[in-house]
């Protein structure tokens, strides 16, 4: 009986360790190979990776040590809703623009690395664009500014 229990325990422990290893694999390295989209705001161009699945959105820009100035990540949700973001496992400071279906920026939040405080949209939005911290203010882009790109045209 004791031997049977030990065998069951070892099997359960092995299964648990395998499950932990498989589920944590996605956070061992940053996401670098996501589909991309070109966005603009006036003369400013953005090369944004698209985080469109729940897994891609959950990982986001975690574990990145740097990001080129013209690049970012746009989070695409199925429906407009109040969106809140944390900086868990995110190593670089970011600015997040919360964007309505038509590409208008609702609000922008500045976010510190590794902080667990929530940064939320002021109203329901479908899109959130993360860029290096201060990128929007340096370009004169603020709440009410409009972004152009195929994602926003598709919503018309």
What are these regions (language model features)?
Residues 2-13:
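Bacterial N-terminal signal peptides that target proteins for export
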Residues 2-3, 17, 96:
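Low-complexity, intrinsically disordered short peptide segments enriched in small/polar/basic residues
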Residues 12-20:
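Gram-negative bacterial Sec-dependent N-terminal signal peptides
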Residues 21-26:
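N-terminal signal peptide c-region/cleavage motif recognized by signal peptidases
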Residues 27-156:
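Compact, glycine-rich, soluble single-domain proteins
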């Amino acid at each position: 009986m004791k031997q049977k229990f030990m065998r069951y325990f070892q099997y359960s422990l092995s299964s648990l360790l395998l499950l932990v290893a498989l589920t944590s694999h996605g956070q061992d390295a940053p996401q670098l190979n996501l589909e991309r989209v070109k966005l603009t705001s006036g003369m400013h161009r953005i090369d944004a990776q698209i985080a469109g699945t729940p897994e891609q959105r959950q990982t986001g820009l975690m574990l990145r040590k740097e990001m080129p100035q013209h690049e970012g990540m746009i989070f695409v949700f199925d429906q407009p809703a109040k969106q809140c973001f944390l900086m868990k496992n995110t190593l670089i400071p970011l600015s997040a623009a919360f964007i309505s279906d038509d590409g208008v920026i609702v609000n922008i939040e500045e976010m510190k690395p590794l902080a667990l405080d929530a940064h939320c949209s002021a109203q329901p939005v479908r899109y959130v664009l993360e860029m290096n911290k201060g990128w929007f203010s340096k370009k004169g882009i603020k709440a009410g500014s409009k972004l152009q790109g195929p994602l926003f045209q598709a919503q018309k």
